[in-house]
């Protein structure tokens, strides 16, 4: 069953310029993983420092494999130095989809 991971994290706006290259690296590495259909971050235009997260995974096994990657470990280890906080991410199981 397809999984969607969606939510937000916060980063102090003054750290965004230094943090963006890490987001780009994480997106590229994650998108290359088997089972990843989509992986992205978006900065909220109305609330500086609020980052929206969207991921799509083939199944739970693919998501669990993602959590065990070296790039995920580096990503999480970098968070304290950039002040990443308020991690609010949720997984959704998708039973079906249709175009809107």
Regions from the language model: what does each represent?
Residues 25-37, 56-90:
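An amphipathic, aromatic/His-enriched active-site/gating alpha helix that lines ligand/cofactor pockets
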């Amino acid at each position: 069953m397809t999984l969607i991971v969606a939510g937000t994290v916060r980063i102090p706006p003054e750290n965004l310029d230094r943090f963006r290259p890490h987001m780009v690296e994480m997106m590229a590495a994650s998108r290359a993983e088997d089972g990843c259909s989509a992986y992205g971050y978006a900065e909220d235009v109305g609330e500086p420092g609020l980052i929206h997260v969207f991921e799509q995974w083939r199944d739970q096994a693919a998501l669990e494999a993602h959590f065990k990657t070296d790039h995920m470990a580096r990503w999480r280890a970098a968070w304290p130095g950039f002040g990443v906080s308020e991690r609010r991410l949720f997984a959704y199981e998708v039973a079906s989809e249709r175009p809107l």
